[in-house]
Amino acid sequence: MELVFIRHGFSEWNAKNLFTGWRDVNLTERGIEEAKSAGKKLLEAGFEFDIAFTSVLTRAIKTCNIVLEESNQLWIPQVKNWRLNERHYGALQGLDKKATAEQYGDEQVHIWRRSYDISPPDLDPQDPHSAHNDRRYAHLPSDVVPDAENLKITLERVLPFWEDQIAPALLAGKRVLVTAHGNSLRALAKHIEGISDADIMDLEIPTGQPLVYKLDDNLKVVEKYYL
């Protein structure tokens, strides 16, 4: 069975070198072109999907739509879910990465960004940009909405969606596209590939490039490659 991951195309805050997380920013022209290229590659390689999963953030949704349009599959069902959102970067969201390193030191920022189980400082729930004040999360219990996450917590958030939605779709024989974010996809990759806590820190997923998994009947990875 086939599973394809695509990290959203290059975003406005990727271009500005800002911590993004759950902040909702748009694609750049480069990001749009990356998504178009991904869709064309999938079309040329003969990939057909039965269902697509994405987050509730604009950059991932738009990437999904563009990829499906370019591959002539915009009509297939799409499921949007908050569990596929990017890792929440807490109080770092909206800050310049270079300036943050100058303020707190390279080592501290590296720990916040790359350690598996250490989170950055929480974002104040009363902050106007907090997810607690965003109506797309109004249906969630307050204690479920994060104020900051590390990759371990991100995996704990993403995994129920894998088990409840993505894995059952694959086991039912559906061909699945997941268009999401660097860290939510890294979390899924860690789970399905069995990557260790230490090794996952070295895994990078580039923007806008289809990552193909061939899986056996037990959802074990048989083959993995980029188009």
UniProtKB/Swiss-Prot annotation:
Annotated pathway: Carbohydrate degradation; glycolysis; pyruvate from D-glyceraldehyde 3-phosphate: step 3/5
EC number from the UniProt entry: 5.4.2.11
Keyword annotations of the record: Gluconeogenesis, Glycolysis, Isomerase
Binding site for substrate: 7-14, 20-21, 59, 86-89, 97, 113-114, 182-183
Residues carrying the site annotation Transition state stabilizer: 181
GO BP annotation list: gluconeogenesis; glycolytic process
Catalytic activity: (2R)-2-phosphoglycerate = (2R)-3-phosphoglycerate
EC main group: isomerase
Molecular-function annotations in GO: phosphoglycerate mutase activity
InterPro entries documented for this protein: His_Pase_superF_clade-1 (IPR013078), His_PPase_superfam (IPR029033), Phosphogly_mut1 (IPR005952)
SMART domains assigned: PGAM
Active site: residue positions: 8 (tele-phosphohistidine intermediate), 86 (proton donor/acceptor)
Family matches, as SUPFAM superfamilies: Phosphoglycerate mutase-like (SSF53254)
Cross-referenced Pfam families: His_Phos_1
Protein family (similarity comment): Belongs to the phosphoglycerate mutase family. BPG-dependent PGAM subfamily.
Subunit record text: Homodimer.
Function: Catalyzes the interconversion of 2-phosphoglycerate and 3-phosphoglycerate.
HAMAP family, per the entry: PGAM_GpmA (MF_01039)
Name recorded for this polypeptide: 2,3-bisphosphoglycerate-dependent phosphoglycerate mutase
Naturally occurring in which organism (per UniProt): Pasteurella multocida (strain Pm70)
Taxonomic placement: Bacteria, Pseudomonadati, Pseudomonadota, Gammaproteobacteria, Pasteurellales
Recorded name of the encoding gene: gpmA
